[in-house]
Amino acid sequence: FIAYAIMSVPAGLMIDRFGEKPVLFLGFLMPFIGTTLFACLHTYPMLLASSFIIGLGMAMLQTVLNPLQRVVGGEENYAFVAEVAQFVFGIASFLSPLVYTYLIHELNPDIYTEGRNFFIDLLAGITPPDLPWVSLYWVFTLLLLVMLVAVGLSRFPKIGLLKASSIKSSNKFSPK
C-alpha cells in the first residue's frame, strides 16, 4: 500500500504531461515487470521488490482508469460504468481462488501427468515443482502481456479533463 501513496500523485502529474495512453501502458508494464521478475527469481527479497513494483503500477492504473470511466460512458452514465468496472473486479476476485486451486492441484507432482493439458504442461515447465503457486504469477504475467498489446494497439482520443480533475487547477501548488 505504500506504493499507492508514493505513486498516485506522480501518476496524476504524468497524465497531465503525457496523456492517458502512455500512463495506462506504463501502468500495465510495471506489474508485468514485477510479476515476471518474481516468476523467474522466486526469493523473498524479490517478492518484496516485485510486490512494490506491482503496487506502483496498480496505483498508476487506478489514477488513470478512474477518470477514463467518466469519459467512456459520458458524465450521465459515469455511475453505471463505475459499477460495471466494480462488477468485473468482483468476478475476478471470485475466480482467482478457483484458478489458484486448479493450478495448485494440477501442478502437484503427485497428480501432474504430462500431455493432458498444453497450458498446464507449459506452466509445469516454467514453475518449480515445490512452488506451484508461482504459476499464478505466470498467469498474471500473460494477462498483463495481453493488456499491454491491447493498450499499445488502441487509439485514444484526446481527452480533456474537467478543470477540477487537473492538478494544475489548484493554486496550492502554483508558484506565486
Give residue spans per PLM region.
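Hydrophobic core of transmembrane alpha-helices in multi-pass small-molecule transporters
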Residues: 46-61
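C-terminal membrane-cytosol helix-exit motif in multi-pass small-molecule transporters
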Residues: 100-109, 118, 122, 128, ...
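Primarily marks hydrophobic transmembrane alpha-helices of the MFS/SLC 12-helix fold
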Residues: 21-24, 47
